[in-house]
A protein has these predicted regions:
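Conserved N-terminal segment of class I S-adenosyl-L-methionine
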Residues: 1-156, 160-164, 176-177, 243, ...
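A short His-aromatic
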Residues: 165-169
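A SAM-dependent methyltransferase catalytic signature shared across enzymes that methylate proteins
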Residues: 14-20, 224-242
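Flexible loop/turn segments at secondary-structure boundaries
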Residues: 128, 171, 198-201, 247-249
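A short glycine-rich, Lys/Arg-flanked "PGG" loop and its adjoining helix->strand segment in the class I
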Residues: 174-189
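Short glycine-/acidic-enriched loop or helix-start segments at secondary-structure transitions
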Residues: 107-108, 172-173, 201-203
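Short, glycine-/aromatic-enriched active-site segment of Class I SAM-dependent methyltransferases
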Residues: 193-220, 225-230
Length: 291
């Protein structure tokens, strides 16, 4: 495979190839298409590069060109997640692994005495791993796939795995969930945090949700139902969900279950998704096109 070869993908959640294009998205994505699965309602990008290539792009092109989590808006959402998870699970004394740990800011927050967690990160960016090392945060420098391949999961498992604003940025969300399952102790919990944007009141102009850069660096977009489905298909029973309808964030917690048993989950109506984006596009163009 060449470095930037894009390959077609079916729906990450249910595997269906039957999808409808969300026409409104092209206006914001430099003509790149966005699709919604007609079977389950997942919003996703069909054409993608390899998992390692996408991790490389995030490490070299995005983080190395000035992205930082050390701004008030990001710290606020990380603190929100810390409070929500601690209220639900009481993480004091528990081991927490953050997949896609970034600069380690969330782990800094939850290792403080207020929360008292024991922290670890898996992070592909060498720059970010060095930042965490300088701050005495233990990290595995590589992708989650690299971590699994290293064999470390045989002796190192965690009470809680957090995937914060990361699941939507990886090439395969299913592979990410399988990896989270593998690194958790029996009865452990996974936490997925992302933006609350789909089938909720519009939170921002659409150009600040969709953008012109390569769309496979953000190949899925989750709703309440599809985040629940992602957990169920990965072997997790959803136990907690935040009040996502009127906040910026969608935060779900799932408990590691028996993967051999089917877990039912609700689906979204794909036509409602298409109509939702059409309304969002109209609202943006009518009132916020120059915002």
């Amino acid at each position: 495979m060449t470095k930037d070869e894009f390959l077609p993908h079916n729906c990450d959640l249910c595997g269906s190839a039957d999808a409808a294009e969300i026409e409104a998205a092209k206006h914001y994505q430099n003509g790149q298409p966005l699709h919604v699965c007609k079977n389950c309602g997942l919003v996703y990008i069909k054409e993608r590069r390899s998992a390692n290539r996408i991790a490389e792009v995030w490490s070299e092109d995005i983080y190395e060109k000035g992205y930082t989590a050390k701004i008030p808006a990001v710290k606020a959402r990380q603190t929100y997640v810390a409070d929500f998870v601690d209220d639900a699970l009481n993480i004091k004394g528990k081991s927490v692994c953050d997949i896609g740990g970034g600069e380690g800011q969330f782990l800094e927050i939850i290792r403080e005495p207020t929360y008292g967690a024991s922290v670890f990160a898996i992070e592909p960016s060498e720059r970010n791993c060095q930042l965490m090392a300088d701050n005495n945060i233990e990290a595995f420098c590589g992708s989650i796939e690299d971590y699994i391949d290293s064999g470390k999961t045989k002796n190192q498992k965690f009470d809680v795995v957090t995937i914060m604003w990361t699941i939507e940025n990886c090439q395969s969300c299913r592979a990410m969930m399988e990896a989270a399952y593998d690194v958790l102790k029996d009865g452990g919990h996974v936490v997925i945090s992302t933006g609350s944007r789909i089938l909720v009141p519009f939170k921002k102009p659409l150009q600040y949700y969709l953008g012109p850069k390569a769309t496979d660096t953000h190949p899925i977009r989750l709703s309440n139902n599809t985040i629940t489905g992602l957990m169920a298909e990965g072997g997790f029973e959803r136990t907690h969900i935040n009040r996502f309808i009127d906040t910026e964030y969608l935060v779900a917690i799932g408990k590691k279950a028996d993967r051999s048993k089917k877990i039912d989950w609700p689906k979204d109506d794909w036509s409602a998704i298409v109509e939702f984006f059409s309304r969002w596009h109209k609202e943006t163009q009518d009132h916020y096109s120059d915002a």
